[in-house]
């Protein structure tokens, strides 16, 4: 394999990663959410959503209503949580929310940051769930939970790119 073929393969791989990044950022701008697509990581929302379901979010500064399924992040942690709005009220110009997983016995007050009694719709919500694809995100869970699977997939992607003759 000559240098021109190697450079072409490298550029093809860079093109794939760049395209994925541009699509991700474009979705973020369109949906006004830093994470427009999330994967359900636990069974707390069963039977509505199963572990491994992919959720598509929308966050165009809409107020959440009781019964809406929202994704939020707790201050200081980067793990998105998918739960249903149990209660909402307004405090001056802020919408405050209390959430609960459908499969959980109690509300999420114990999950929130210390001294936090409600979620702030503007600062804590990642988005509201608008659509989902069942089980397609299970690969993400495998990659996250299994180091060997993660490196195996990465290795296969690199090898397949290097062995391609185009």
UniProtKB/Swiss-Prot annotation:
Cell compartment(s), UniProt: Endoplasmic reticulum membrane
Main localization, broad class: endoplasmic reticulum
InterPro entries xref list: LexA/Signal_pep-like_sf, Pept_S26A_signal_pept_1_Ser-AS, Peptidase_S24_S26A/B/C, Peptidase_S26, Peptidase_S26B
Keywords: Endoplasmic reticulum, Hydrolase, Membrane, Protease, Signal-anchor, Transmembrane, Transmembrane helix
A single GO molecular function term of this UniProt record: serine-type endopeptidase activity
A GO BP entry: signal peptide processing
The protein's enzyme class: hydrolase
Keyword Iron belongs to the record: no
Stretches assigned to the Lumenal side: 31-166
Catalytic residue positions: 44, 83, 108
Catalytic reaction annotation: Cleavage of hydrophobic, N-terminal signal or leader sequences from secreted and periplasmic proteins
Location of region: C-terminal short (CTS) helix: 152-163
Segments traversing the membrane: 10-30
Cytoplasmic side: 1-9
EC number: 3.4.21.89
Entry-linked PROSITE patterns: SPASE_I_1, SPASE_I_3
Membrane topology designation: Single-pass type II membrane protein
Pfam families: Peptidase_S24
Subunit relationships: Component of the signal peptidase complex (SPC) composed of a catalytic subunit SEC11 and three accessory subunits SPC1, SPC2 and SPC3. The complex induces a local thinning of the ER membrane which is used to measure the length of the signal peptide (SP) h-region of protein substrates. This ensures the selectivity of the complex towards h-regions shorter than 18-20 amino acids. SPC associates with the translocon complex.
Function (record text): Catalytic component of the signal peptidase complex (SPC) which catalyzes the cleavage of N-terminal signal sequences from nascent proteins as they are translocated into the lumen of the endoplasmic reticulum. Specifically cleaves N-terminal signal peptides that contain a hydrophobic alpha-helix (h-region) shorter than 18-20 amino acids.
Protein name as it appears in the record: Signal peptidase complex catalytic subunit SEC11
Organism of derivation: Scheffersomyces stipitis (strain ATCC 58785 / CBS 6054 / NBRC 10063 / NRRL Y-11545) (Yeast)
